[in-house]
């Protein structure tokens, strides 16, 4: 069975817990409001950037590894924590590369927004909001957690999310955070 989130169960279909499967379900359920552009080139960019944020070895994956590292390295690990770390593929090689990979992805995303801005556009791709904009708005909280009133997280878990290295903090281009805040204000 599926024991991770998010999970979407729809009709009699199997539960979905992969970002792209959930996205494709949303596309089928409401084809008039596409989150993936219909233009082929933009579609490829949308899926590629979405993977860079959500997918294996993407921003979320690498930030999670960085978040787990101090706990795994500690002698005072919560019960069952290593099972969760193992489930998510925690390994020393990927952990050592997590910051570097995160920085690269943040630079790609900032560059894309700057490119769009020079063309008078306010979204990652094209002239309208796409999955990339929503994914960035959500996953950006792994780099800079929004205040509790905007992003409720259990007070005992907030320190885990707020423990962000200076390397990552320094890569948070203002254009990324302004975009996150605008998307959150306008769409959430």
Residues covered by each model-derived region:
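GST-like domain detector, emphasizing the conserved glutathione-binding G-site
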Residues: 1-81
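Generic alpha-helical structural signal
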Residues: 20-23, 47, 103-107, 177, ...
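Short acidic (Asp/Glu) and glycine-rich catalytic loops that position anionic groups and cofactors
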Residues: 2-5, 117, 160
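Residue-level detector of alpha-helix boundaries and kinks
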Residues: 7, 11, 31, 87, ...
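GST-like fold's C-terminal all-alpha helical module
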Residues: 48, 55-156
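Short His-centered aromatic/hydrophobic patch
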Residues: 139-188
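C-terminal alpha-helix
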Residues: 25, 29, 112, 182-186
